A protein has these predicted regions:
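ATP-dependent carboxylate activation and anion-phosphoryl transfer catalytic cores
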Residues: 56-137
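Phosphate-binding site of ATP-dependent enzymes
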Residues: 3-67, 93-95
Length: 137
């Protein structure tokens, strides 16, 4: 059994997209639950969470969490697309919760929303991911 102290703070999701042979970090998404916690219901129940993209973070914090996401993507040898979920504490410390190498790709999922904020439409995102997959054999 693995136990860890609960980390409380802001829920952030940072999508990393492989472009031109390297990682491109998309705008940060913040999930603000209507209730107290960002749990299963808050994640999947319509209207239970407000998504803010780009997240309302200062430039230093934005650069820090985007850099951490890119570093995790590279360290784990990821390709294509991944979503890095983090908690940002009130002290400004970022903790990675998970790195999802198969993130949701519906039009309401976090990665397509971040891509849209970066000027990459839903169809263009899917086309890019398919092209990347085809080049990998």
């Amino acid at each position: 059994m693995y136990k860890r102290q609960q980390v409380v703070g802001r829920e952030l999701a940072i999508a990393v997209l492989e472009q031109d042979g390297g990682p491109t970090v998309l705008p940060v998404v913040e999930a603000v639950p209507v209730g107290d916690v960002y749990d299963f219901e808050a994640r999947y129940e319509a209207g239970a969470t407000h998504l803010v993209c780009p997240a309302d973070l200062d430039s230093e914090t934005t650069a820090k969490v985007m850099g951490l996401a890119a570093e995790a993507f590279g360290a784990l040898g990821c390709s294509g697309c991944a979503r890095v979920d983090m908690i940002l504490t009130s002290e400004g410390e970022a903790s990675i919760l998970e790195l999802d190498t198969v993130p949701g790709l519906t039009q309401t999922s976090l990665v397509p929303q971040a891509a849209e904020a970066a000027g990459i439409g839903f169809e263009a995102l899917l086309e890019q991911l398919l092209k990347l997959a085809l080049t990998r054999n």
